[in-house]
Amino acid sequence: MNYLIVISFALLLMTSVESGRDAYIADSENCTYFCGSNPYCNDLCTENGAKSGYCQWAGRYGNACWCIDLPDKVPIRIPGPCRGR
């Protein structure tokens, strides 16, 4: 019985769970995507696997795209400088 529990727990840990997060989507240089309209951001976010997105006006990084439920594999804006501009 204990072996069954241990094996079940091991299988649970080995399965990859794709989680999502809400964040500013970023390019490879840690720069946000500048925006002026919600449809632009929604398209950008959904093309990258998010549920939706919108333009966050006058936010922490200026006018930038904010994505809802963005997959872990997509880069997000992290603290530090934007290296591309």
Swiss-Prot record:
The keyword Secreted applies. GO terms for biological process: defense response. InterPro entries: LCN-type_CS_alpha_beta_dom, Scorpion_toxin-like, Scorpion_toxin-like_sf, Scorpion_toxinL, Scorpion_toxinL/defensin. It holds the Pfam family Toxin_3. This is Makatoxin-2. It comes from the Eukaryota. Residues 21-83 form the LCN-type CS-alpha/beta domain. Keywords: Disulfide bond, Neurotoxin, Secreted, Signal, Toxin. This protein markedly relaxes the rat carbachol-precontracted anococcygeus muscle. This relaxation is inhibited by the inhibitor of nitric oxide (NO) synthase, N-nitro-L-arginine methyl ester (L-NAME), suggesting that the response induced by this protein is NO-mediated. One of its GO terms (cellular component) is extracellular region. It comes from Olivierus martensii (Manchurian scorpion). Residues 1-19 form the signal peptide. It is found in: Secreted.
